[in-house]
């Protein structure tokens, strides 16, 4: 037995030795637990923040799940909203790693906050109506019918801007009962019976089957929406952001978008 230990025991009364050793054992376990907790926390995936237009909700949710499955250290989290709202959030300092908008104008507004945008998908407009089309709407001209409750996205929102462009091509003037902050708001109002019709993306009708029906808009009156995506320059995880962007543009990512009704990038 080392002399130091012998001297220690001689200096400490026997009645105190057992409590002392118990205390040392408890402290040792506590330190080990703290170390184990730190390692566990370090193994948790970090959150890749993606700001995406509301019309991308279903497709990007699937893309995010697939990307997370292929990259266990990353968990993709989304903020879905109107494109202009997302850009405003970025301009006000909200943290994000990727931005995907429903039009090039909104992406342009992001300016130097983002890297070089790349178009990754397209979309077209459709008239959304209640299931069974009880008001027998067949064209954009019918939306000007007296007494018909029409809801549109606000003009500063891409879907609202595109809707006004389509109505202009058709020579139709509509006074909506409501202007929504995103295209999803239009879908919700119609599906709840609070409006009779509206103009949304084809993908919105596909995603809400059973809740709303769609009436096609002729090509000459329709508008093709272009969706750009870019990494955010001050994002926390630039490498993962680039990898997610590459996945969206990949054949696999494009198939997910096509399965959700999106067109190839125009």
Describe each region flagged by the PLM:
Residues 1-32:
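Sec-dependent bacterial lipoprotein signal peptides
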Residues 3-4, 30-69, 84, 88, ...:
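Exported/periplasmic ABC-transporter solute-binding proteins
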Residues 73, 95-96, 195:
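Short, high-confidence coil segments that cap the C-terminus of an alpha-helix
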Residues 87-92, 108-115:
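Acidic/His-rich segments in extracytoplasmic proteins that coordinate ligands and/or metal ions
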Residues 93-102:
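Short, structured active-site "lid" loops
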């Amino acid at each position: 037995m080392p002399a130091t230990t012998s001297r220690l025991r001689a200096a400490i009364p026997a009645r105190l030795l057992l409590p002392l050793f118990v205390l040392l054992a408890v402290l040792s376990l506590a330190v080990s637990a703290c170390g184990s907790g730190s390692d566990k926390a370090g193994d948790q995936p970090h959150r890749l923040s993606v700001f995406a237009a509301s019309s991308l909700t279903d497709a990007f949710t699937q893309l995010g799940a697939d990307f997370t499955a292929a990259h266990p250290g990353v968990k993709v989290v989304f903020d879905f909203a109107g494109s202009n709202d997302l850009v405003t959030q970025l301009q006000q300092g909200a943290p994000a790693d990727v931005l995907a908008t429903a039009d090039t104008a909104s992406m342009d507004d992001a300016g130097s906050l983002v890297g070089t945008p790349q178009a990754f998908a397209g979309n077209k407009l459709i008239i959304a109506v209640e299931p069974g089309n009880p008001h027998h709407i067949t064209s954009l001209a019918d939306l000007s019918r007296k007494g018909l409750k029409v809801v549109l996205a606000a003009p500063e929102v891409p879907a609202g801007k595109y809707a006004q462009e389509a109505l202009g091509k058709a020579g139709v003037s509509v006074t909506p009962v409501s202007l929504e902050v995103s295209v999803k708001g239009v879908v919700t109002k119609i599906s709840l019976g609070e409006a009779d019709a509206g103009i949304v993306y084809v993908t919105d009708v596909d995603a809400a089957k059973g809740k709303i029906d769609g009436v096609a808009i002729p090509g000459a009156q329709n508008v093709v929406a272009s969706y750009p995506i870019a990494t955010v320059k001050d994002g926390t995880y630039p490498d993962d952001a680039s990898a997610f962007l590459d996945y969206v543009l990949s054949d696999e990512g494009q198939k997910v978008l096509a399965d959700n009704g999106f067109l190839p990038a125009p």
